[in-house]
Amino acid sequence: MTAPLERIKLILQTQASSSQLGTSKRSSYSGFLDAMIRVPQEQGFWSLWRGNFLNICRYFPAQAINFSCYDLYYDAYRYMIRPETAYSHHLLPFLAGGSVGVTSCTILYPFTFCNTRISVDVGDNKSIKREYYGLNDCIRKVYKSDGYRGLYQGLAFSACGMFLYRSTYFGVYTFGKLTYLSQGTPEIHSVQTPLLVSLFFAQLASVIATLITYPMETIARQKMLLSGRGLQSYESYRHMVGRITRNDGVFGLYRGMFAKLLTTVCGSLILVTYDLITDHYKKYKSKRFRRKLEDFKKSDER
């Protein structure tokens, strides 16, 4: 459902470094509505889903890593920090969330890289030739030009941005729930909040995380576009930020953010759904254990 929004976001976000846009054959997109109208006209309606299959292949493992590793990191940080104050308690979700973000980003980065390169390819094989036709084609061409290093362009900034995003995403959500309930314990799974309240804090967490980290994501995405052009075309992060702000101002770091904010609804729904599932599972385990304990006591009395 959100694939067209994701592709429009990527195109707007990276067009300052695109070799296909800003030429006599195809001008740059002025904004969200301009891109939504012109992309189907220039590349066909189904081009709005270009790169979506690869994004799906990346998305499920990423969410699995995020939620399965969150509790592991949370328990590890709790053991190392041994929190005694409210501040140290609330710090745990931020650290655990950031750590799972870096983990998933690093493991799945080649998929993220290829998804970006394929999605921002605005070629239609008529006026502009397409650069990549799939995952294998993208990897082969980038590796031939730059080696494996080319597949990891922008990893440093992307990992830093993901740490901030996930730490804010999980941290704000947890902190908001605990503040609402005025509980003394920071354990996310030991408290229950109304569904609408959980959705509100999840959406708030997604929006805040996006506003904070979007410039870092923009720089990382544009860094990805330098791969495949030869090592001589590589640009430092400092020079890239200077080029973007010099040409478009600070606003250039936030191009495409409106489309990104529209997709945050899905992120908040996933977080709340995961919370509900884990709560029900813990209740089920607790009831089952209590039932087994009662049966054991009855058999012992006999």
Model-inferred region functions:
Residues 55, 59-67, 166:
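Specific transmembrane alpha-helical segments of multi-pass solute transporters/efflux pumps
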Residues 48-50, 153:
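Membrane-interface alpha-helices at helix entry/exit sites of multi-pass transporters
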Residues 1-6:
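Hydrophobic transmembrane alpha-helices of multi-pass solute transporters/permeases
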Residues 51-59, 158-159:
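Hydrophobic alpha-helical transmembrane segments of multi-pass small-molecule transporters/permeases
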Residues 31-43, 50-53:
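Blade-loop segments of beta-propeller domains
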Residues 48, 63, 81-82:
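Short, flexible active-site-proximal loops enriched in glycine and acidic residues
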Residues 9-29, 33, 67-149, 153-156, ...:
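Flexible extramembrane linkers and terminal tails adjacent to transmembrane helices
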